[in-house]
C-alpha cells in the first residue's frame, strides 16, 4: 500500500510531545538526515546515532511501515477558535485580492508566484489546486496555458518531467490558500 498522509498543525512540536514516534530517515547521495516532517508512529528499527529510523522512509514503505508527515502551517496561528475556523473556511475568498502583489506575497504556498497568479488568475478551489500543481517542476510546462489545457493533463500522474503534486495534496493546499486569503482580509 502506498499512502501519503500529511497533517497540518500550527505547532507540530505540541503533537510530537504527545505521540510516541521515531523521525523518518532520509538519504541523499549517501548522506543521512532526519526527514523534515515525516515520522513513524509505529515501531521501526532506530538508528541511535542519527536519532531516526534505521531504514530510509522509501524503503520502509515497501516493507509495510507507514510514515506520517506532521507539518507546521503558521496560517493556523491566525485562527481564534473552532467557530472562527469553520466560518473562515466556509467563506468564499475574494480571489481578486491576489491581483494585489503585496497581498499575494503574504499568502501561503503562492507568495513567490505573484506574476503568474496575476497572469493566470486562479479564482476557485479547483483552479487554485491546479495552479499549485503547475508550480511544481513536473507540471511547469502548463504555466501560462489556458485553464482548459491545464486541466487536460495536470492530474495525469506523469512525473517524467520532475516532481508532481497529487490532486489530493493540491486541493488541500488550495483550501489552505483560500483560508489564508480570508484570514488576511479579515486583518485588513
Language-model segments: what does each one mean?
Residues 1-187:
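Mg2+-dependent phosphoryl-transfer active-site scaffold
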Amino acid at each position: 500500500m502506498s499512502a501519503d498522509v500529511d497533517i497540518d498543525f500550527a505547532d507540530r512540536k505540541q503533537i510530537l510531545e504527545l505521540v510516541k514516534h521515531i523521525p523518518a530517515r532520509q538519504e541523499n547521495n549517501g548522506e543521512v538526515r532526519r526527514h523534515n516532517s515525516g515520522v513513524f508512529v509505529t515501531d521501526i528499527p532506530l538508528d541511535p546515532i542519527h536519532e531516526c529510523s534505521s531504514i530510509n522512509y522509501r524503503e520502509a514503505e515497501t516493507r509495510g511501515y507507514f510514515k506520517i508527515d506532521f507539518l507546521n502551517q503558521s496560517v493556523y496561528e491566525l485562527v481564534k477558535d473552532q467557530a472562527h475556523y469553520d466560518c473562515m473556511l466556509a467563506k468564499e475568498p475574494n480571489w481578486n485580492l491576489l491581483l494585489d502583489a503585496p497581498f499575494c506575497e503574504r499568502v501561503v504556498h503562492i507568495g513567490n508566484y505573484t506574476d503568474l497568479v496575476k497572469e493566470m488568475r486562479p479564482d476557485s478551489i479547483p483552479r487554485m489546486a491546479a495552479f499549485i500543481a503547475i508550480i511544481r517542476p513536473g507540471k511547469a510546462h502548463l504555466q501560462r496555458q489556458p485553464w482548459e489545457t491545464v486541466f487536460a493533463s495536470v492530474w495525469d500522474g506523469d512525473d517524467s518531467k520532475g516532481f508532481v503534486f497529487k490532486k489530493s495534496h493540491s486541493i488541500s493546499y488550495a483550501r489552505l490558500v483560500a483560508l489564508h486569503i480570508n484570514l488576511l482580509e479579515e486583518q485588513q
